Amino acid sequence: MNLFLITSAIHTNYSNTSPEDRLRETIDTAESIKKYAPDSKIILIEGGKPLPQHIKDRLSIFNEIFDFSDHPVMQMTQSDAQLAVDNVGHSVKSAGEAYILKEALKKIDGTYDRIFKLSGRYRLTERFNIQDHIHKDKYVFLPKAPTDKMNMIDADAKTIVTKSSIDFSPWRYETTFYSFDNIPKAQMIFEYIFNSLVETYSEGNYIDIETATYLTINKEDVIEVPVIGLTGVLGMDDRSIDK
């Protein structure tokens, strides 16, 4: 069996989209998985504001919900990240995502052929081919892409992080949708990324999870595929993607 981990923030201050629309789109995410990856287990990992029970009742399409919305670390992460928000005028959600992923992996029971991380509100398409992901002990990503210019806070020094061992990179991995099969290894990766991002933000610097992921994962452990079968609208840009 395969497992889909859906990272979500249905109620959040960092979006112009209403909670009702975000809820509907998150349900659409699960429905697309049932269509294109039937018999998979689907877990919602919620990191936004606490969900009222009537909202949780509408999320029955998910096999489980891991709710980290009221966790003290999530509140701390948002506070530290505000430093970077002030610097670059952009909502920083990367540390929160790394945190809920590393914590979610600790709660997973059972063995799975493949674990897919998919951001809520995006959907699988007919171009999704599960065979593209069958690579033991490998991460499967879309091809690396140029780093967003917002990561270049200290262009003169060519570095973003001063103490966390993450340096400037011209490349990033798209983390909206990817897969892996080694849970202990992935848990260590997310732990390292989370600690590095929090340290970075607390120093008033900025790096996103996409660039940090590229810098952290051993390139020999990565398989890049040209098409991954994903569609949706980028929340910050209102720009449609189909990859």
Where in the sequence are the language-model features?
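ER/Golgi luminal nucleotide-sugar-dependent glycosyltransferases, focusing on the catalytic module
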Residues: 1-243
